[in-house]
Regions:
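Active-site beta->alpha loop and helix N-cap motifs at the rims of alpha/beta catalytic domains
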Residues: 1-83
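Hydrophobic alpha-helical scaffolding
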Residues: 11-15, 47, 98, 167-171, ...
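Glycine-enriched alpha-helix->loop->beta-strand junction motifs that scaffold or abut catalytic
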Residues: 66, 86-94
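Catalytic alpha/beta core domains of metabolic enzymes, predominantly
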Residues: 92-236
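Generic secondary-structure signature for well-ordered alpha-helical cores
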Residues: 23-30, 63-66, 110-121, 149, ...
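Flexible, acidic glycine-rich loops studded with aromatic residues
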Residues: 197-284
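Short catalytic-loop micro-motif centered on adjacent basic/acidic residues
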Residues: 70-74, 94-98, 275
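Residue-level signature of catalytic and energy-coupling elements of molecular machines
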Residues: 41, 87, 234
Length: 284
């Protein structure tokens, strides 16, 4: 290791850690028939605007780890959407990260479906290819509320209007994306793939620890519970979940109300679409 450069050394250490994690999770992978038990490794963020470089890095990491329960984490930047499709077409599992809007989510989901269609057209298997679409939650509330507070300070908004959306935009934004997930993966085009053994690309709720102490620790976990989803929680949220939470399928209801809430926030002067784009740029 001492002869490696900084970036190569970092990658080697990550490979060792992720390989160990994947081996630890392998029994779950086998038990669930490749449904769960995955470990993710991220391509370099310096490649976030490099389609060709991202594909090459994903293939290299996949081959080095040589385990079926690995996901290669790739950001959903405009340049990487084609890379995501190309990597999936090669039969490599992908964790698509840094999704903040329905617009970007739709591109990610369609890239997944297109990749499987391309494999099927070539007579290649679509079984056991797994992917998640990591959709971020709490960061949305944080940036929307900060933007609104700035508007209030500038005299461009009324402080009392905040109660209309306080702690609700992240969940609403996620529900809008989930409604799109249900529509896309119940379509005739995906049904044909499902008959060949294809799995849905599950939405993964990321950043689900509450950043504001006034919120219930498991707020996002409770509100986003639903079928075919994954939730990555920080340790404190896991402890709060174990201590007591009400888990019921709330995610499947309220899509229309979610759209109305986001529209209301926009009318108050908060540029939600622009803020969601800024979150992705900052995340990279």
């Amino acid at each position: 290791l001492k002869d490696l450069g900084t970036e190569a050394l970092c990658e080697e250490l990550m490979l060792r850690d992720v390989a160990a994690a994947a081996d630890l999770l392998r029994p779950m992978y086998d038990l669930t028939g490749a449904g769960d038990g995955y470990a993710s490794i991220e391509v370099s963020p310096y490649l976030a605007a490099d389609e060709k470089g991202t594909v090459e890095a994903a293939v290299r990491l996949w081959n080095k780890l040589n385990r079926p329960n690995i996901m290669i984490k790739i950001p959903a930047t405009p340049e990487c959407i084609p890379a995501i499709q190309a990597v999936l077409e090669k039969g490599i599992n992908v964790n698509v990260t840094l999704i903040f809007s329905k617009e970007v989510y739709d591109k990610v989901a369609n890239a997944y479906i297109s990749a499987l269609q391309a494999r099927a057209a070539r007579g290649e298997s679509v079984r056991n290819i797994s992917s998640v679409a990591s959709f971020f939650v709490s960061r949305v509330d944080a940036i929307v509320e900060k933007n609104f507070d700035d508007l209030v300070k500038a005299g461009k908004a009324k402080a009392e209007d905040k109660e209309n959306f306080f702690g609700k935009v992240g969940v609403a934004n996620s529900k809008v994306a989930y409604a799109s997930f249900e529509k896309l993966f119940s379509s005739d085009s995906f049904k044909a793939l499902k008959e060949q053994g294809a799995r849905v690309q599950r939405p993964l709720w990321a950043s689900t620890g509450t950043k504001n102490p006034v919120f219930k620790a498991v707020m996002y976990v409770e509100e986003l519970a639903g079928r075919d989803t994954v939730n990555t929680m920080p340790p404190a949220t896991v402890k709060a979940l174990i201590a007591g939470a009400t888990i019921e399928p709330r995610l499947h209801n309220g899509a229309a109300e979610a759209v109305a809430l986001i529209s209301k926030v926009n009318t108050l002067g908060v540029p939600t679409e622009q803020l969601l784009k800024e979150l992705q740029v900052a995340g990279v």
